[in-house]
Swiss-Prot record:
Belongs to the UPF0128 family. InterPro entries: UPF0128. It comes from the Archaea. The lineage of its organism: Archaea, Methanobacteriati, Methanobacteriota, Thermococci, Thermococcales. It holds the Pfam family UPF0128. This is UPF0128 protein PH1314.
Amino acid sequence: MIKMLEGYYIIENPGVVPAERRFRMKDLKAWGYDLHLGTIEGERAYFISKTGERHEGETYIFKGKEYHVSRTQKEIPENARLLARIIIERGNPYLEVWLEEEDVKFPLTKEDPRIILKRIWEKEKLNQLLKHVRAVGLTTDFYKDNVFTQGIPLPYEEYPPKVRRVLREVKDIHRDLTGFGRFVFQYFGEVDKMHNYRLYWTLPTLHLFDIDIANEVDKVLGMLD
């Protein structure tokens, strides 16, 4: 849904925020983890450790349990799925990650998503996301204020081609990548060859753990700089 309301250009896809999502090995790597096959207390299991921290053949104790690394996976096993979801407990968000192998579920981690997102964005140099994030829960809010000279926001018909291209990119992200989102935009023209604008963008947090989607969102946030 697209509408213009009192100087605000709004792109809204009011779909359902997904309960869980499938991820790839490249995403897990971007989060800063290795995936291992081995044993926990002698029972076959998949588990994770920080990148490069554990090695094949190593046995160690973590939180009172004995872990043995038989193999460090290069890919997600063909008969398994890497899944994650955002949950809210006592007002705080958590990212739960697990591996499903047929009917068996192997819990991998439960962490504050803000910590992992910050780690990803710093590692991948996604500076727009780092700078403009405002809130993280089931959804994540970004706010960017590039208003140098306050005035009356322009109607869509007066937007220059570069601004319209940004709006098309936002529509594509909502339609093709996230299925949900709300983008609110005000444009005040150019000042000294710099675009004068303000935006608010809400996206499902879970999708931002997909490194390709995170890169696309970061790119769009920086297109008018």
